[in-house]
């Protein structure tokens, strides 16, 4: 995959801002025996190129001032909320130096496996890209992984897939054979049996006679008698 870049003379925050306002993206290419070079690219062309997987994972042919160099995309800085590429970095590729890259994994065939087709399991993709080292001429655009042989209760590990010629995986974290794909059995929902409804309580039979009237409220007690008058003293 090839693209065109242009030499950039001015650098700095102000120069980069003016460059972006004119529809360009500032960048740099470094590595190899040559000195780092400031470049600029057409933003719209770069934006569409970045949507392609091959632009991120394969050796690119970059043309600058009539000269073509083989490079790898190493870093992209995006605006936090605008569709804008702020800066981009490329590294020159030496044909005699091994590369360390992340290569996408392309999975296929899971729908034809017994795990999915017969046992109705779910396929969980644990790893979507693989760290590898290889010579530039051996770098694959992607690694195809066949899942048509998956069975219930199994997993697919790194040693189960066939890597392209000259490609060596980079193992991290002490895992010599990490899992790439796991098979998740279907979830069976057991419905609890519905208990028989309890019979409704029988209403009490109504009395034949009329309901007794409530007892009459007692009248308040008579007021206490007045004390007797004192006898008059005799003269």
UniProtKB/Swiss-Prot annotation:
Residues 212-228 have a biased composition (Low complexity). Keywords: Ribonucleoprotein, Ribosomal protein, RNA-binding, rRNA-binding. One of its GO terms (cellular component) is cytosolic large ribosomal subunit. One of its GO terms (biological process) is translation. One of its GO terms (molecular function) is structural constituent of ribosome. SUPFAM superfamilies: Ribosomal protein L25-like. The keyword RNA-binding applies. Residues 201-235 are annotated as: Disordered. This is one of the proteins that binds to the 5S RNA in the ribosome where it forms part of the central protuberance. Part of the 50S ribosomal subunit; part of the 5S rRNA/L5/L18/L25 subcomplex. Contacts the 5S rRNA. Binds to the 5S rRNA independently of L5 and L18. Belongs to the bacterial ribosomal protein bL25 family. CTC subfamily. This is Large ribosomal subunit protein bL25. It comes from Verminephrobacter eiseniae (strain EF01-2). The lineage of its organism: Bacteria, Pseudomonadati, Pseudomonadota, Betaproteobacteria, Burkholderiales.
């Amino acid at each position: 995959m090839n693209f065109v870049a242009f030499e950039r003379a001015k650098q700095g925050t102000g120069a980069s801002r003016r460059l972006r306002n004119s529809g360009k993206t500032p960048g740099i290419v470094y590595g190899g025996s040559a000195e780092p070079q400031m470049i600029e690219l057409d933003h719209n062309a770069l934006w569409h190129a970045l949507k392609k997987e091959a632009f991120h994972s394969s050796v690119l042919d970059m043309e600058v001032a009539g000269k073509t160099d083989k490079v790898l995309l190493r870093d992209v800085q995006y605006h936090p909320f605008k569709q804008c590429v702020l800066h981009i970095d490329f590294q020159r590729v030496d044909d005699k130096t091994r590369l360390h890259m992340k290569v996408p994994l392309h999975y296929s065939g899971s729908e034809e496996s017994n795990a999915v087709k017969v046992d109705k399991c779910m396929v969980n993709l644990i790893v979507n890209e693989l760290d590898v080292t290889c010579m530039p001429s051996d770098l694959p655009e992607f690694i195809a992984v066949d899942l048509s042989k998956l069975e219930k209760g199994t997993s697919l590990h790194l040693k189960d897939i066939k890597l392209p010629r000259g490609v060596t995986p980079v193992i991290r974290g002490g895992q010599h054979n990490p899992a790439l794909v796991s098979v998740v059995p279907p979830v069976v929902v057991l419905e609890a049996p519905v208990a028989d409804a309890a019979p409704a309580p029988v209403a009490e039979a109504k009395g034949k006679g009329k309901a007794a009237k409530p007892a009459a409220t007692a009248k308040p007690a008579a007021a206490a008698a007045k004390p007797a008058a004192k006898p008059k003293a005799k003269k």
